[in-house]
Amino acid sequence: VSKLVLIIGLICLFSCRALDFYGDADKPFFNSDKKEIANPEAADSLNVVTFNIKKARKIELAIAEMKALEKKTPVDIYLLQEMNEEGVEAIAKGLGLNYLYIPIAYDKSDKKDIGNAILTKGTIAHPEKLILPHAKWQNQQRRAVTIGEVNIHQKKILVFSVHTETVAMSRKMRLDQVDSVIRYGQEEASHYKYVLIGGDFNTAFPKYSHSVVNKFNSNGFDWQTARVGSTAKAMMGLVTPVNDYLFSKGFVCTNAYAIRDSRSSDHFPVFATLRY
């Protein structure tokens, strides 16, 4: 119990940064949609990585790690969280990717925007920002989801890059955020054969993790990274939660793992191969 109280206290303490919230549903958006980058070839599977790069502070190291992964297994879509525009542009340039980046707030302590991004070897259409319910009482910060239609392998995929609230918010409110993501995915699923939802759901404790997974499963989304194990580390490695997930419709997972030798964040990149 004492460890639990300490963890919650530390999370609350470090989540009270001064932020300016971007409340407009249609701005600011940053995107690159270069047709010459896009891979028009058909394929039987999609390689995906979700990765929270901790306020985009170690971008050069993250890019080096991504390039090392690309040499072994080319990645078609990256879902990134805690990003700023400079970090997204550097990754896109370094790996030859198109991107959609939607900041949700300006972090006054870092003097940079922070938000979620989708990067891909395909093209991205129909960008949207889904603002999630409930503001954090400490600083009135809101969370949002970056959504776009990725066209790759002659397929159209509705893609979500998600970052929901920490335990600084009540469990019920955090589940409301999860419900909002699922509801939007359900509404749009009729227009898409393939839906991909991934990111950092801040499920620091197993009971809450089970609740999140059950919500997605009961609404027809498969947890494609169920066998990956821990995806993050905290308190000098004493706590190793499952925070990062890939859920989908229309795919079958053939391989998934966390890259635990990564040193560019307190989260591990989570990789999955999804067969169409």
Predicted features by range, described:
Residues 21-33, 79-158, 162, 258-261:
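Structured beta-strand-rich core segments of catalytic domains in phosphoester-bond hydrolases
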Residues 58-62, 83, 140-142, 172-180, ...:
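Soluble or luminal CAZymes and related metallo-dependent hydrolases
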